[in-house]
Amino acid sequence: MALPSLHEFPWLTTVIVYPVVAALFIPLIPAPAGDPTTRVYAQKLAERVRWFALFIAVTDLLILLAGFYVGYDPSQTSLQLLERYTWVPQVGLSWSVGADGLSMPLILLTAFVTTLAILAAWPVTLKPRLFYFLMLAMYGGQIGVFAVQDMLLFFLMWELELIPVYLLLSIWGGYNRLYAATKFILYTALSSLFILVAGLAMAFYGDPISFDMTDLAHKAYPLSFQLLLYGAFLIAYGVKLPVFPLHTWLPDAHGEATAPVHMLLAGILLKMGGYALMRMNVGMLPDAHLYFAPVLIVLGVVNIIFAALTSFAQRNLKRKIAYSSISHMGFVLIGIGSLTEIGMSGAMLQMISHGLIGASLFFLVGATYDRTHTLELEEMGGVGLKMPKIFSMFTACSLASLALPGMSGFVAELMVFIGMATTDAYSLPFRLVVVFLAAVGVILTPIYLLSMLRQIFFGPENKELTEHEELVDAEPREVFIIACLLIPIIGIGLYPKLVTSLYDQSTNALVALLRQELSSIGATVAQAPALYSAD
């Protein structure tokens, strides 16, 4: 029997299944000799498990890179690395995975950030078997969300990553971890019901009965039905993005999470909402998107302004960065709603950029907390001289977050601004108001971020902190993690085509689809609802 060629190899299935299956072998890792109740025993056991988990994550990343090199062509808009295996033919259910420009960059981001998150989890010694089992299971589930091309399978993957996050928060979180974990699961699980109901409605509408996303995208849905589906999906994905006022779970979750969980929440979890909006709301329901596009833009502006002002008022370091993340996600909504190629491309780049910047900032927040044992900014101060490496890295990542030219955030936000300013789908007054308000949010960002740096590293010296023996500078592992994140942040800022070339064909195809729908009614978006109603 001949072996399959490299092009026929199930790359994506392997990348999804491999970490999940490997996690099942963690209980079989031999325990070290000694008394299980001692700290030395816990450290030895944790060391064995963490090396195993890191090996699995690194090899999975290498497998993904091999598949990307062998079978992915960025110039194509069609699905690539496609695999379809019949599962339940009676209802058209199959294991269907594939990647295009919308998913491949986020799959690569997931593998990269998760590998670094496992390395960031090095200090974890409490229940290491369960901790790394959940990390690897979440790894497979998150890649699955971006790779699957079956609606029911998408829902299952969406749910798969909820359970690990809940347990990681409730067991390894801070003082209010149970409250934060419960709030997270209530928000996300209840919102997931909208995905299930809307997905079933799409699958069973008309012929054929199918959960395949390609089939669903080609069905002719009545406009009223599209609007209902769009609203249901918007609620579900708005919770995950998150969109005001569905955002309140995020500051609580970040407030209690550990550093590696922070990295996955900020780096990957929020991007699932933006990806799903592009894939389903725009790609499958283009007529409805013309109605909702102005709504997305308004919500994006509210996200930017509200979260920036709220972040400015926060005195807890984790919550301040959490609200900063919410503010940055507002640009994703504006870009998606702009109906321009550069705006849609900017929204995609903003997700990738924030995935890197958010992961780096939250990792540094965790590193700072491990040394100072406080998150209250009033209790910090004067630690910059004691921790020059952490101060330098924190400053660099904060500058990236405030969109300093030469870093990825600047390019992404600039593209969204240009897309919103140049679109012909909205009236000039509307565009000017949106651009002005978004610019106000951009101005607020350096105010609260630079103020945060001043409070942590400068200002009146807190003797209890600066004289504490645990107040040591960054170790090589921590410097390596931040270097791995900063290099692509700066690389994208200097040469954005490095990343935009991976997805531009796909985002341009989305905009072309929307423009086709818009030209068929010969109107701006603001006029579209009236014309549709007249029909």
From Swiss-Prot:
Main localisation, per the record? membrane
Keyword hit for Transmembrane? yes
Regions crossing the membrane:
9-29, 51-71, 106-126, 130-150, 152-172, 184-204, 227-247, 258-278, 290-310, 326-346, 347-367, 399-419, 432-452, 479-499
HAMAP family xrefs: NDH1_NuoM (MF_00491)
One Pfam family named in its UniProt record: Proton_antipo_M
What catalytic activity does the UniProt entry give for this protein?
A: a plastoquinone + NADH + (n+1) H(+)(in) = a plastoquinol + NAD(+) + n H(+)(out); a plastoquinone + NADPH + (n+1) H(+)(in) = a plastoquinol + NADP(+) + n H(+)(out)
User: Under the cellular component aspect of Gene Ontology, which terms does the record hold?
Assistant: plasma membrane-derived thylakoid membrane
Lineage, top-rank taxon, reads Bacteria
**Protein source organism:** Synechococcus sp. (strain JA-3-3Ab) (Cyanobacteria bacterium Yellowstone A-Prime)
Question: What are the protein's GO molecular function terms?
Answer: NADH dehydrogenase (ubiquinone) activity; ubiquinone binding
Q: Which protein, by its recorded name, is this? A: NAD(P)H-quinone oxidoreductase chain 4 2
Function of the molecule: NDH-1 shuttles electrons from NAD(P)H, via FMN and iron-sulfur (Fe-S) centers, to quinones in the respiratory chain. The immediate electron acceptor for the enzyme in this species is believed to be plastoquinone. Couples the redox reaction to proton translocation (for every two electrons transferred, four hydrogen ions are translocated across the cytoplasmic membrane), and thus conserves the redox energy in a proton gradient.
An example GO BP is: electron transport coupled proton transport
- The secretion signal range is none
In which family does this protein belong, per the annotation?
Belongs to the complex I subunit 4 family.
Kindly give the InterPro entries that the UniProt entry links to this protein.
Answer: NADH_Q_OxRdtase_chain4, NADH_Q_OxRdtase_chainM/4, NADH_UbQ_OxRdtase, ND/Mrp_TM
Q: How does it sit in the membrane?
A: Multi-pass membrane protein
EC number(s) on file: 7.1.1.-
Where does this polypeptide localize? Answer: Cellular thylakoid membrane
Task: Write out the entry's keywords from A to Z.
Answer: Membrane, NAD, NADP, Plastoquinone, Quinone, Thylakoid, Translocase, Transmembrane, Transmembrane helix
